Amino acid sequence: MGELLAGRPRPLGSHFDGEGVNFALFSSGASRVELCIFDGLREQRLPLTARTGDIWHGYLPDAQPGLCYGYRVDGAFDPSRGQRFNANKLLLDPCARQMDGWVVDDQRLHGGYHQPDPSDSAEVMPPSVVVDEHYDWQGDRLPRTPWSQTVLYEAHVRGLTRRHPGIPAAIRGTYAALAHPVMLDYLTQLGVTALELMPVQQHADEPRLQSMGLRNYWGYNTLLPFAVDNSLAASDDPLNEFRDTVRALHQAGIEVILDVVFNHSAELDVDGPTLTLRGIDNASYYWLTENGDYHNWAGCGNVLRLEHPAVLHWVIECLTFWHEVCHVDGFRFDLATILGRLPDFSSSAPFFTALRNHRSLRDCKLIAEPWDISPGGYQLGQFPAPFAEWNDRFRDDMRRFWLHGDLPIGVLARRFAASSEVFERGSRQPWASVNMLTSHDGFTLRDLVCFNHKHNDANGEQNRDGTNSNFSFNHGTEGLEADETTQARRRVSQQALLTTLLLSQGTPMLLAGDEFGNSQQGNNNAYCQDNALAWLHWDQADDALLAFTSGLIRLRRSIPALQRGRWWRDDDEDDVRWLNAQGEALTPYEWEQGTHQLQIQLSERWLLLVNATPQVSDFSLPEGEWRVAPPFSATDHLLDGQTWRGQANAVCVLVKQ
């Protein structure tokens, strides 16, 4: 390996050009930066003497992909001013595409409290790895499904595939399993158009979980945002395995949306390890108080500071990597309010401006989780176009309407119409409302109708973790086991919830497994359960519920009013009509105080009937000859073509002949 040359300041990270590797690292407060090269246990330290602005850089001739490296960054250790430099700590490149190994908690990883910790961390710190980004995409084309035709499917790579009997055991639980024909066929037959993957960025397990023998299964503890998580790979080449999977999904017409975490890092609070950003430029990367402590708006010990130009550049470059190098179609941003903090939230924050102006990111699907845990954190409806947003009002109101009956028909209608009172502003369209009943965070749909209370004891926190505001209803018996009458009522509730989800205006999101009744045994916070509790139970699938769900998605595609990218107009019968059980327009009283009965006529030809009452009720239908539309049973209670006898808490869809 030749002498270290000056190299160039851009792009950040390590980049192989066919003849050598360029290294570039941002640090505004460092006094010295050393590039550390590893050959087995042998470490060679090469000072980066070239500096352009705040970028330290060098070029290593003859270096090849697979080279293991890290950094030691020296400077002041003054926590009161936010400076925590410690050259005793080997640091990961924040732009690294791969890490060799896994972070196992060790006291030597700690950088120090009031004084720098003197122990060297190299022996216990996995290094970064140089990666060749070249890849033959074989003509891959992004599906670019219009938002108005999108059906999201939220899934965990391991959870979705680990127990699937049709996938070879050697690849179950990995990216390769997602690309297996059995899984591709399943997703296409179900009818979803986009796979929203829970985090696949390289993460680390919190020391607390490691001490209990648990893992951060969900992965919302990002360590290296540019790196494909190696724990989800079947091969020793995670990047290319992931790209193979993206290409296979695209060939099946399925988009790939990544759940990304840019609100905090795996370094946690002051008690956490010094692995990368803290030791490189703590004061630039993190939001700090006046005395140098970490803000905790994400509830994870630290908060990334996207208001800083260098941090913003880092995040935008990371998203560009995933989109342009890995061909992902979009992103869901975890605790996205933090991304717009200045420190108060602003819809015109630099991050949003950078996305809108970017050459390619502006065309991606962008989804915000529109809250964080700090004051002013709840920002539903406040994100700028072209963002869509997870709509927790849809989730909670639909649960309350169907399972508790404590909301009027008017609330159901507002949620059914893409929560227009929240999202219809500026240039935003109905698809901006991502409608959901469940997500990874909370009960599954099956558990929602089987448990009144969470059962999270396996998480090791005495059942204190996880929300208590579930709006669930066990139908009289706590737990999965119940008599047939109770089970029948639960099935009716699941069907009603799924119908209003998949036939509402907006963008529906289905949690993987809800389509066939998957359960997590009442655990509503399975973030640390990398085991059979959280993996999908394919062997227990309810085939009838699966057929019903896929039929609803097909029905959704056939209704023009649900495929349009514009808001419904009440005066346009080709959009929607809201009728009472007598087939007449609802009165103001009925909207807010009337019985829980409604007829929703869509595009003139389709009629969604809602009887959310505890008794059988007859509905007088609008003029026309009606029949029951699949996936609803042809034997459903259509009496004479003009009357529907609705069972308690039931829904049905009719189509005009």
Curated annotation (Swiss-Prot):
Outline the segment boundaries, as ranges, of region: Disordered: 458-485
Provide the reaction this enzyme catalyses.
Answer: Hydrolysis of (1->6)-alpha-D-glucosidic linkages to branches with degrees of polymerization of three or four glucose residues in limit dextrin
Q: Which residues form the active site?
A: D334 (nucleophile), E369 (proton donor)
| UniProt keyword annotations, A-Z | Carbohydrate metabolism, Cytoplasm, Glycogen metabolism, Glycosidase, Hydrolase
Q: Which GO terms describe its cellular component?
A: cytoplasm
Which one of the record's GO molecular function terms can you name? Answer: hydrolase activity, hydrolyzing O-glycosyl compounds
Task: Quote the temperature dependence note.
Answer: Optimum temperature is 40 degrees Celsius.
A Pfam family matched in the record: CBM_48
List site positions: Transition state stabilizer.
D441
pH dependence of function: Optimum pH is 7.
Polar residues composition bias: residue spans:
465-475
Q: What does this protein do?
A: Removes maltotriose and maltotetraose chains that are attached by 1,6-alpha-linkage to the limit dextrin main chain, generating a debranched limit dextrin. Hydrolyzes the alpha-1,6-glycosidic linkages in amylopectin while does not hydrolyze the alpha-1,4-glycosidic linkages in amylose. Native glycogen is a poor substrate.
Cross-referenced NCBIfam families, in alphabetical order? glgX_debranch, PRK03705.1
State the name under which the record lists this protein: Glycogen debranching enzyme
Q: Source species, please?
A: Dickeya chrysanthemi
Lineage, opening ranks: Bacteria, Pseudomonadati, Pseudomonadota, Gammaproteobacteria, Enterobacterales
